[in-house]
A protein has these predicted regions:
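N-terminal loops that bind phosphate or other acidic moieties
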Residues: 2-348
Length: 348
């Protein structure tokens, strides 16, 4: 239990002490229903696992996804000044404008798959500080941004897909992973939005400089977030926390979104029990990060765009899992004997 110091992060840490849990009784009823559906048990593979996951978090035998959204957070990064990206920082605003005009990849996927889209522009004209020179955020600002992200599920949603946009944010994510998990910085750095060898080397150098500068803060995941993260990453931490409080499942997108999840996983792995990981990014270190969190992604399509595009595709799988489980006929419907109990190893 954290000591009460009156510091902004104490309010955030207090939320970790009151975690909602899945309804195991509802999950058990869903498992029994699954055993009675008109198919060989297990024949829908991971869709069956997802359906039981949803049943537990929704607390019902027949889960439904009717109000899914993509929550897309955009932020800018002071470390961009270190020459770590081929793209000017203004592209972040350009892409936010494009999200609003329905011209980006994520807009097409949301329209196709029936997903709402909420775009959050996080003070793009005031990038977080350059972490090679000072912490990206102060504690008050970081905590306030986490709290802002907690509002993303306001209005009632039943599935949240997280996405992001921010020139330079793969560098911030790589720094977070390196700070959380250690190892060679080079192993956490990839091409981002098309970095060449020189830019990749500058990413590595910037992260090493930041790790040395903030060495005294590396034993606290929230401090790591504060020192290296962007506002979009901090806000996504908040969304994951608030979704847990409301028992709303979360779909984690790729490399950058996973860095927000990693901060929480390092605090307590159970903080991610309501999360599904959408896909393995083509960003080289993403598989390594997933392994560090003990997570398996649903898809591996070689994608590395961000924007929540991988999460949007995975949401289609989640919706499919709910629809098949909840809508299919059962053995009893066609006059066959019901399965009335499950072996202990199949009850969950």
């Amino acid at each position: 239990v954290p000591t009460a110091t009156g510091l902004p992060f104490d309010d955030i840490r207090a939320l970790f002490e009151r975690l909602t849990q899945p309804d195991l009784e509802a999950r058990g009823r869903a498992a029994l229903r699954n055993a009675n559906l008109l198919k060989p048990t297990g024949s829908l593979g991971e869709l069956e696992d997802i359906a039981l996951f949803l049943a537990g978090w929704q607390g019902v035998e027949k889960p439904q996804i009717t109000r899914p959204i993509v929550a897309l957070f955009a932020g800018n990064h002071g470390v961009h000044a270190q020459g770590i990206s081929r793209w000017p920082m203004e592209i972040t605003q350009t892409m936010v404008d494009m999200f609003m005009q329905s011209g980006a990849a994520i807009n097409q996927l949301c329209a196709l798959h029936g997903l709402g889209l909420k775009v959050f522009d996080l003070a793009l004209d005031m990038p977080v500080h350059d972490f090679t020179e000072e912490p990206a955020m102060d504690e008050k600002g970081c905590a306030a941004t986490i709290a802002f992200g907690m509002e993303a599920i306001a209005g009632g949603v039943d599935l949240v897909c997280l996405g992001e946009m921010g020139i330079g944010n793969t560098t911030a994510a790589s720094a977070i992973y390196a700070a959380l998990y250690g190892g060679d910085v080079e192993d956490w750095v990839g091409d981002g939005a098309g970095a060449d060898d020189d830019q990749r080397a500058r990413k590595v150098a910037a992260i090493k400089k930041g790790l040395a500068l903030h060495a005294s803060s590396l034993n606290d995941p929230l401090e790591i977030l504060r020192c290296f993260g962007g506002r979009e990453i901090a806000a996504m931490v908040g969304t994951i926390i608030s979704a847990r409080a409301e028992r709303v499942p979360v779909v984690i997108d790729g490399f950058v979104v996973s860095s927000a999840a990693a901060v929480l996983h390092k605090i307590d792995p159970a903080l991610l029990d309501h999360c599904l990981f959408a896909h393995v990014s083509a960003e080289q270190a993403h598989q390594k990060a997933l392994g560090a969190m003990g997570q398996k992604a649903l898809l591996n399509l070689g994608m590395r765009l961000g924007e929540g595009t991988g999460a949007a595709l995975a949401a289609m799988l989640v919706k499919s899992a709910a629809s098949t489980h909840s809508g299919m006929a059962t053995f009893a419907d066609i006059g066959l004997p019901e399965v009335t109990s499950l072996p202990a190893d199949q009850e969950s």
